[in-house]
């Protein structure tokens, strides 16, 4: 994906060196946007191999509304381990906000169910929005949401999604986020009877950690390969009915993975 390599090069060449919460140091830019046409293939990096299993299981975990890493651990996914407490809990992170946002009357709002219903019943609405940024609960979260708000848009029988990501770890996080929200868009499109349109990724603080520079330079020497295609089980018509086996990535060829430390 040339769009991602362009982002990587832009941050390396134009970014400002700044301190950060982790003490690692970053080079960052503020405000950057990428667009991916889902009709051209599934936007997963080919200049380094990604662990698709982690991406799919994390998304299913979000959609379950869960905030304990037990499900992830049972399925061989360790990407949230560093932030969980001794019981595996993370506080009211993504799943809680997506599926169980606290309402003033003591009840809860299922933003995902409302989203799907809204797309079906009023596709032209400009209110197809899900937010994970809850100011009343952000201090209770092990890690405040980085990808914090997304909006869907219907036109010409296609469903597009725009994500706003306040904090974007360009080397480790962003490739996962692109694939995750592209997949979510395809899933929502299927259950609402639409085709996949564009995934638009808008970044706030887009940063490369200083200890990722060598890895970024290596990746920039590689050339993108043709995108694979994601096959989704067409029998699934409920957004909460998907399982891992409903997804098959066809034709994925990628260069070797590039290891890099996580800044916690």
UniProtKB/Swiss-Prot annotation:
It is found in: Cytoplasm. Pathway: Pyrimidine metabolism; dTTP biosynthesis. It is an enzyme of class 2 (transferase). Pfam families: Thymidylat_synt. GO terms for cellular component: cytosol. Its EC number is 2.1.1.45. It catalyses: dUMP + (6R)-5,10-methylene-5,6,7,8-tetrahydrofolate = 7,8-dihydrofolate + dTMP. The keyword Cytoplasm applies. DUMP binds at residues 21, 126-127, 166-169, 177, 207-209. The keyword Cytoplasm applies. GO terms for molecular function: thymidylate synthase activity. HAMAP family: Thymidy_synth_bact (MF_00008). This is Thymidylate synthase.
């Amino acid at each position: 994906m040339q769009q991602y390599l362009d982002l990587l090069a832009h941050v390396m060449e134009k970014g400002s060196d700044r301190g950060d919460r982790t003490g690692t140091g970053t080079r960052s830019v503020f405000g950057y946007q990428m667009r991916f046409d889902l009709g051209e293939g599934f936007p997963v990096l080919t200049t380094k191999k990604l662990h698709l299993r982690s991406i799919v299981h994390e998304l299913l975990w979000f959609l379950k509304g869960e905030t304990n890493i037990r499900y992830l651990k049972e399925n061989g996914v360790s990407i949230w381990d560093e932030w969980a407490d001794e019981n595996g809990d993370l506080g009211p992170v993504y799943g809680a906000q997506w599926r169980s946002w606290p309402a003033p009357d003591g009840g809860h709002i299922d933003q995902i169910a409302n989203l799907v219903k809204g797309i079906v019943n009023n596709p032209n609405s400009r209110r197809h929005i899900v937010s994970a940024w809850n100011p009343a609960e952000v201090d209770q979260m092990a890690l405040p949401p980085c990808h914090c708000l997304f909006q869907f848009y219907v036109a010409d029988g296609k469903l597009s999604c725009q994500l706003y990501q306040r904090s974007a770890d360009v080397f480790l996080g962003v490739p996962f986020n692109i694939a995750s929200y592209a997949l979510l868009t395809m899933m929502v499109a299927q259950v609402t009877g639409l085709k996949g349109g564009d995934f638009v990724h808008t970044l706030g603080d887009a940063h490369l950690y200083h200890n990722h520079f060598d890895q970024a330079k290596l990746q920039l020497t590689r050339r993108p390969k043709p995108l694979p295609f994601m096959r989704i089980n067409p029998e699934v018509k409920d957004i909460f009915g998907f399982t891992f086996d409903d997804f098959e990535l066809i034709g994925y060829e990628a260069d070797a993975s590039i290891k890099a430390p996580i800044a916690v």
